[in-house]
Amino acid sequence: MPSQMEHAMETMMLTFHRFAGDKDHLTKEDLRVLMEREFPGFLENQKDPLAVDKIMKDLDQCRDGKVGFQSFLSLVAGLTIACNDYFVVNMKQKGKK
């Protein structure tokens, strides 16, 4: 029986390939749709309407208009780290009360 972590890994792979389709990469439009559907809270909290464009620029290291799986994982990892930092701060504040 797969562990929770194995399910999480499978979810990341399936999500990437669902939005990439038959390709082995995400286009800017693929990334925009993925972000809107899978990270709606993140985009809603962005004050910059060009947030997806900036994320694409950061992730597209080859400057070919494509984001591969490794770069996608970097995005997920970065968002997870930011969420964890927020979580830890809130847990510490709750502990002080």
UniProtKB/Swiss-Prot annotation:
The modification N6-acetyllysine is found at K23, K28, K54, K57. Keywords: Acetylation, Repeat. Residues 47-82 form the EF-hand domain. GO terms for biological process: membrane raft assembly; mRNA transcription by RNA polymerase II; positive regulation of exocytosis; positive regulation of focal adhesion assembly; positive regulation of plasma membrane repair; positive regulation of plasminogen activation; positive regulation of stress fiber assembly; positive regulation of substrate adhesion-dependent cell spreading. Disulfide bonds: none annotated. GO terms for cellular component: AnxA2-p11 complex; cell surface; collagen-containing extracellular matrix; membrane raft; nuclear matrix; plasma membrane; plasma membrane protein complex; RNA polymerase II transcription regulator complex. Signal peptide: none annotated. One of its GO terms (molecular function) is calcium ion binding. The keyword Acetylation applies. Residues 60-71 are annotated as: Ancestral calcium site. Transmembrane segments: none annotated. The keyword Repeat applies. InterPro entries: EF-hand-dom_pair, EF_hand_dom, S100/CaBP7/8-like_CS, S100_Ca-bd_sub. Because S100A10 induces the dimerization of ANXA2/p36, it may function as a regulator of protein phosphorylation in that the ANXA2 monomer is the preferred target (in vitro) of tyrosine-specific kinase. Heterotetramer containing 2 light chains of S100A10/p11 and 2 heavy chains of ANXA2/p36. Interacts with SCN10A. Interacts with TASOR. Does not appear to bind calcium. Contains 2 ancestral calcium site related to EF-hand domains that have lost their ability to bind calcium. This is Protein S100-A10. The lineage of its organism: Eukaryota, Metazoa, Chordata, Craniata, Vertebrata. The gene is S100a10.
